[in-house]
C-alpha cells in the first residue's frame, strides 16, 4: 500500500474542515457560545487527543481541576485522562484538534444520534461518559 502526503492550502473564510488520513485527523474547528462545554466529562481509554488554540481561549476541565488555554497554547490529553472542554470566552474560539480517526468517527456518531444512545456509542470506541 502506497500513501501520499497531503498538503492543504489555506482557504480564507472556511471553517470546520478536517484533513483525514488513515489513522489521524487534523480538524480546524470553531467553538461558538460563551463558556459552554462541548461534551460531559468523559475518558478515552485507548486514545490521546490534542488541541492547539489559534484564537480566543478554551477551558479544559479534568478531574479536580480546570485550566484555561489561551491563543497559542497546545493541550495534550493522554489516553485514560478524564476531560472535557469548551469555549472560555464570550466570542468564538478557533482551534486545531488532532485526534485518531476513530475518535473522529465517535464524534460523528454522537452528532447523528440521540443523547440516550451516547453511553453505548462511547463504549464502542473504548471511551466512557463520566457524567
Range-by-range predicted roles:
Residues 28-31, 43-61, 98:
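Short, conserved beta-strand element in jelly-roll/cupin
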Residues 88-131:
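Double-stranded beta-helix
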Residues 64-82:
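Short acidic-glycine-tyrosine-enriched beta hairpin
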Residues 60-61, 77, 83-89, 94-97:
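Short beta-strand His + acidic residue motifs that chelate non-heme Fe in jelly-roll/DSBH
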Residues 5-41, 47-48:
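A short glycine-rich, His/Asp/Glu-containing loop-to-beta-strand
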Residues 50, 57-59, 66, 82, ...:
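Structural motif
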Residues 22-23, 31-36, 57, 66, ...:
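Short, charged/polar surface micro-motifs in flexible loops or helix N-caps
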Residues 27-31, 50, 72-73, 83-85:
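Hydrophobic/aromatic beta-strand elements that line small-molecule binding cavities or substrate pockets
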